[in-house]
Amino acid sequence: WSPVMMRYLERVAEVTPPFRVAVEVRNRSWMEGEARDSFLSLLRSANMAYVAVDEPELAWTVGRDFPVTASWGAVARFHGRNREAWSKKGVTVAEKFRYNYSDDELGSWEAPARAAAGEAERVFLMFNNCFRDYAVKNALRMKCLLGIACSPGEGVQGEIPFDE
């Protein structure tokens, strides 16, 4: 967080209508104390969505708070919780996002997603744990956990063979 970045977001809010904008931050400083209040207030006043992030809990990461700031939608992105890879420098994208969520981890988002659905027109849960087929399988599993058109066998935790 910085005053310069807040001014930048204010400018984004001025020039982007009628487009819908979602803002994802990657440093805890945005969601602490007065910075959090002013940041979320700006998003609400501009009808821009805060992007909640599921990522490893590290000293600098944002945390799993899911405030709804836009009437048109609530957004969460799932990057995986590969703490070891996120803590290292120079890791590949594949290493960083090599994370397959458990049902318990996905289930921890059920109540926040349902609460967001009561405040926003739509809820977007996007999976960016893009190693092999993990994002697709986890998205299908989340769909089933939320009871959204789940077919038998959909979201089953299995391996799809890939060439290395």
Describe each model-derived feature in a short phrase:
Residues 1-164:
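Residues lining hydrophobic/aromatic ligand-binding pockets adjacent to catalytic sites
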